[in-house]
């Protein structure tokens, strides 16, 4: 056995079958190399006391399938270096190992064969955790009843798993495992449990440790890239179930029950799904939170659809049509945009500026603000229509505001007379404006405003940088034109061109 321990590349070595990287001593190796029938002795030896640096229990599943035992040299060399330094790949969180044999020694010996044949984790989970730094302890007294799952071993198992998990940390509660085929034939373990209650109690801890996790993921820590069982063995195909269970187990590298404390309800959930022998697609409610019995996995998807109460929300076409009608009606009634804003503030308590009303008519407000302003303006229109012909509150409000004056329209003949007078005198005096207004039968203010607007128009038509010349200046310069001075009208033509 010393030769086998010194040469770890032998395919029949029990160390590879157990997934351990620590050389075992004579006692541990002798207990683990007994084959399928002798696996019970190995399990009993592991339960009786942990030898320093020993792989206490070996798994017949890996030993019986040489094709699945593949070495990853880099990972094995790391494990060998750790073993030569007196340590273990599992570092400092190996204290839980001695608490694993929480079941009775006799019960473990009675159920070891069934457990080893049914679950590849039954031996390898203990063998991988063997530490040369852990002193041997005497086996604890046998517990009463099937309380193994709630003992110290479970708590230590949680601590060891959380410390050795090398994958990305789980943020929040991890998702429960999906339904899938269970390798190793859990039916055999269930039959053994039905035959002997002690065997069921002893086999319950490995089953809970394995849970729904298939063999590709180690219980202690996981390797990315498909490395399994301390990163040394490839994924063995599930006996009877093909590779279906191994393929579906890549969703969660650590059993969720080992990260958070399991409840008896969750334990019942695991036992309930042990009866399935074929892979199932993951249920939708499993991805939303901890599993609950009685169909309690209904997530927010069922309640996320809230009926939208947008019956009164107008569309963009409705807003555009209303804005157009509102502008036409407002102009017809003779109200300014400022009058509308003032009326809205007085009647409904919401004061709007003239700019806001202008932007509403031009469809330059946001859709939300347009929807808010539309009902107020609609009420104002109804009030204005009902008050036509009778002095009501809206008329009084409009009277307080700035009432729009009717646009002055000047006939073509009158406009021609004003143009001819503008060419003669673009800036007439007050007396000239009064005489012109009387002759044209216009108001004095209308004539004055027309001349002001005409001068502004002339200023806009003249390009900047060119000295503006009035018609009077042109006429006055005609008699003083010299040979070297071009005519003023010629200069104006060139400037326009």
UniProtKB/Swiss-Prot annotation:
Polar residues biased stretches: 465-483
GO molecular function, one term: RNA polymerase II cis-regulatory region sequence-specific DNA binding
Cellular component GO terms held in the UniProt record: nucleus
Composition skew (Basic residues), residue ranges: 269-286
Xref: InterPro entries: HD, Homeobox_CS, Homeodomain-like_sf, Lambda_DNA-bd_dom_sf, POU, POU_dom, POU_domain_TF, TF_POU_3
Pfam families given in the database record: Homeodomain, Pou
Positions of the DNA-binding region: 403-462
Tissues and organs where the protein is expressed, per its UniProt entry: Brain.
Top-level taxon of the source organism: Eukaryota
Reported function: Transcription factor that acts synergistically with SOX11 and SOX4. Plays a role in neuronal development. Is implicated in an enhancer activity at the embryonic met-mesencephalic junction; the enhancer element contains the octamer motif (5'-ATTTGCAT-3').
Subunit structure: Homodimer.
Family to which this protein belongs: Belongs to the POU transcription factor family. Class-3 subfamily.
Protein name: POU domain, class 3, transcription factor 3
Organism: Rattus norvegicus (Rat)
Gene encoding the protein: Pou3f3
């Amino acid at each position: 056995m010393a030769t086998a321990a010194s040469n770890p590349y032998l395919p029949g070595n029990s160390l590879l079958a157990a997934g351990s990287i620590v050389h075992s001593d004579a006692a541990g190796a002798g207990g683990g190399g007994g084959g399928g029938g002798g696996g019970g002795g190995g399990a009993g030896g592991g339960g009786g006391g942990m030898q320093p640096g020993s792989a206490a229990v070996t798994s017949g599943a890996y030993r019986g399938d040489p094709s699945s035992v593949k070495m990853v040299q880099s990972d094995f060399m790391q494990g060998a270096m750790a073993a030569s330094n007196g340590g273990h790949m599992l570092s400092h969180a190996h204290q839980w190992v001695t608490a694993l044999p929480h079941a009775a020694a006799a019960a473990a010996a009675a159920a070891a064969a069934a457990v080893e044949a049914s679950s590849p984790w039954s031996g390898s989970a203990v063998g991988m955790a063997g530490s040369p730094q852990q002193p041997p302890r005497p086996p604890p007294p046998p517990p009463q009843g099937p309380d193994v799952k709630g003992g110290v071993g479970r708590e230590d198992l949680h601590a060891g798993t959380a410390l050795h998990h090398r994958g990305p940390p789980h943020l929040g509660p991890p998702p429960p495992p999906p339904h899938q085929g269970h390798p190793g034939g859990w039916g055999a373990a269930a039959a053994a449990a039905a035959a002997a209650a002690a065997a069921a109690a002893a086999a319950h801890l490995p089953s809970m440790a394995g849970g729904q996790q298939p063999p590709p993921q180690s219980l202690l820590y996981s390797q990315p890239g498909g490395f399994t069982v301390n990163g040394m063995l490839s994924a063995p195909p599930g006996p009877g179930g093909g590779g279906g269970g191994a393929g579906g187990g890549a969703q969660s590298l650590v059993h969720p029950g080992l990260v958070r404390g399991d409840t008896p309800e969750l334990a019942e959930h695991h036992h309930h799904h042990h009866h399935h022998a074929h892979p199932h697609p993951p249920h939708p409610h499993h991805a939303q939170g901890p599993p609950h019995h009685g169909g309690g996995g209904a997530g927010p998807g069922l309640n996320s659809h809230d009926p939208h109460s947008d019956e009164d929300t107008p569309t963009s076409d409705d807003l555009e049509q209303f804005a157009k009608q509102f502008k036409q009606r407002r102009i017809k009634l003779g109200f300014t945009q400022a009058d509308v804003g003032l009326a809205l503030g007085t009647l409904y308590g919401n004061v709007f500026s003239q700019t806001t009303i202008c932007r509403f008519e031009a469809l330059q407000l946001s859709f939300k603000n347009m929807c808010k302003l539309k009902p107020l303006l609609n009420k104002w229109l109804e009030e204005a229509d009902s008050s036509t012909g009778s002095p009501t509150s809206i008329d009084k409000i409009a009277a307080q505001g700035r009432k729009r004056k009717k646009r002055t329209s000047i006939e073509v003949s009158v406009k021609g007379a004003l143009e001819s007078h503008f060419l003669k005198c673009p800036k007439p005096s007050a007396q000239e404006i009064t005489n012109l207004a009387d002759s044209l039968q216009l108001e004095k203010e209308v004539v004055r405003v027309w001349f002001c607007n005409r001068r502004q128009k002339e200023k806009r038509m003249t390009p900047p940088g060119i000295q503006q010349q009035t018609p009077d200046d042109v006429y006055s310069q005609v008699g003083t034109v010299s040979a070297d001075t071009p005519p003023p009208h010629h200069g104006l033509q060139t400037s326009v061109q």
